[in-house]
């Protein structure tokens, strides 16, 4: 989140960022117009307070001298009412300014390509070769249902559409993948494992940038003012909220497992079948808190950490740099990792890794203390390491046999039966 002062001093930069992101830059005009009105009202309020103070002195002097001050007292009463009204106006304008500031997205990093949507994202690299099948590859949901390891019908009976029940080998594989991912990130990459709460307060969701923009995409418990998390990013960004971290403690690297809950309103097409787009799914999330000067190197290593899971599982994938029009609200730069899905005939997103720079740190009030004693905002990074259900779907499709079953990757097999 940016301050009013920052927008005033960097108006052209903010306008350019909004244009690149396909946002309406008139929001800046609206903000500056409200600010101009606020400043006029503040000046008027200051003048009223000056007159009130002067009149108070006159009343005090007349009372001390024993002279009649009734006329001044009546004027003072009216002035106090005017001041009260003016203070309310100023307060309402300040609240309006804050609401507008909350709607401003992060400014894209200079290395992010300008584009209007996903069609203008830039492929960075590929790993592995998609397998050539001697038969028509089946979609993972058919494989799962035929093997009786994914049950969509009973899940729908229990909860409605776009839920799944894992059973038997399916449940065992889902759990094994979670453990495999977490253990790899802890043992090989130096992350600290956290299992966070799955329900968060409004302030927590605001810190990541999910509120107010994405309110309608989250499940909400109004009696408790708690949201079911769409990703462990929410509780983990808030993990150090209100704290001042010592620079020497950075970077902090966390790997968090959680169930995730998303309304997915408006989702349609092939992705709504199977495990790709569920209302509830499991995900392993990577979070970093870094010094500003180190954050882009840390972003590259985070992407590499997420890639390593796919490499160990020998799943073909590609890395894509998102353009300005396709990035998330809080991101300054984002890489997507997309895994090859044979039945789709294309790559499908399985991880998104972003540097939010100081944007989330400011919203969540996470600060760092430099060696000279000054305070700064650290940079916060997040990424999937990986989406578990999508990883299982990719295994089922890429390792499928002609008889409708599938092999288990060697790395996972050794881990599974350890």
Curated annotation (Swiss-Prot):
Localization per record: Cytoplasm
Top-level EC class as recorded in UniProt: ligase
Alphabetical keyword list: Aminoacyl-tRNA synthetase, ATP-binding, Cytoplasm, Ligase, Nucleotide-binding, Protein biosynthesis
Positions with a binding annotation for ATP: 262-264, 349-352
Gene Ontology MF term list: ATP binding; serine-tRNA ligase activity
UniProt: L-serine binding residues: 231-233, 285, 384
Annotated family: Belongs to the class-II aminoacyl-tRNA synthetase family. Type-1 seryl-tRNA synthetase subfamily.
Protein name as catalogued: Serine--tRNA ligase
Source species: Coprothermobacter proteolyticus (strain ATCC 35245 / DSM 5265 / OCM 4 / BT)
Gene name, Swiss-Prot/TrEMBL: serS
């Amino acid at each position: 989140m940016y301050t009013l002062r920052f927008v005033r001093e960097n108006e052209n930069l903010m306008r350019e960022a909004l244009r690149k992101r396909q946002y309406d830059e008139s929001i800046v005009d609206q903000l500056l117009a409200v600010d101009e009105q606020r400043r006029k009202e503040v000046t008027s309020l200051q003048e009223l307070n000056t007159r009130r103070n002067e009149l108070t002195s006159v009343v005090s002097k007349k009372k001390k001298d024993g002279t009649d001050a009734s006329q001044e007292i009546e004027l003072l009463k009216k002035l106090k009412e005017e001041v009260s009204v003016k203070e309310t106006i100023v307060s309402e304008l300040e609240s309006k300014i804050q609401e507008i500031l909350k709607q401003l997205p992060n400014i894209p990093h200079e290395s992010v390509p300008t584009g209007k949507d996903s069609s203008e994202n830039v492929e960075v690299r590929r790993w592995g070769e998609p397998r050539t099948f001697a038969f028509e590859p089946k979609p993972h949901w058919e494989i799962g249902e035929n093997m009786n390891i994914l049950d969509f019908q009973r899940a729908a009976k229990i909860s409605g559409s776009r839920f799944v029940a894992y059973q038997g080998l399916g449940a065992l594989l889902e759990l094994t993948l979670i453990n495999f991912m977490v253990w790899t990130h802890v043992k090989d990459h130096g992350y600290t494992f956290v299992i966070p709460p799955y329900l968060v307060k409004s302030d927590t969701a605001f810190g990541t940038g999910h509120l107010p923009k994405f309110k309608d995409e989250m499940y909400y418990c109004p009696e408790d003012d708690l949201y079911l998390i769409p990703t462990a990013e929410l509780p983990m960004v808030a993990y150090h909220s209100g704290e001042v971290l010592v620079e020497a403690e950075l970077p902090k690297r966390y790997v968090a497992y959680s169930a995730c809950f998303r309304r997915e309103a408006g989702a349609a097409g092939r992705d709504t079948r199977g495990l790709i787009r569920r209302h509830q799914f499991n995900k392993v999330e990577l979070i970093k808190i870094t010094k500003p000067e180190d954050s882009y190197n840390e972003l590259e290593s985070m992407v590499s950490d997420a890639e390593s899971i796919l490499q160990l599982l020998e799943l073909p994938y590609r890395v894509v740099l998102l353009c300005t029009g396709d990035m998330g609200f809080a991101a300054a730069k984002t890489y997507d990792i997309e895994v090859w899905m044979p039945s789709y005939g294309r790559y499908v997103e399985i991880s998104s890794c972003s540097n939010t720079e100081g944007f989330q740190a400011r919203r969540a009030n996470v600060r760092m203390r430099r060696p000279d004693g000054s305070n700064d905002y650290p940079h916060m990074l997040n990424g999937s390491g990986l989406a578990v259900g999508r990883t299982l779907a990719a295994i089922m499709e890429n390792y499928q046999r002609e008889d409708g079953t599938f092999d288990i990757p060697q790395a996972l097999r050794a881990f599974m039966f350890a």
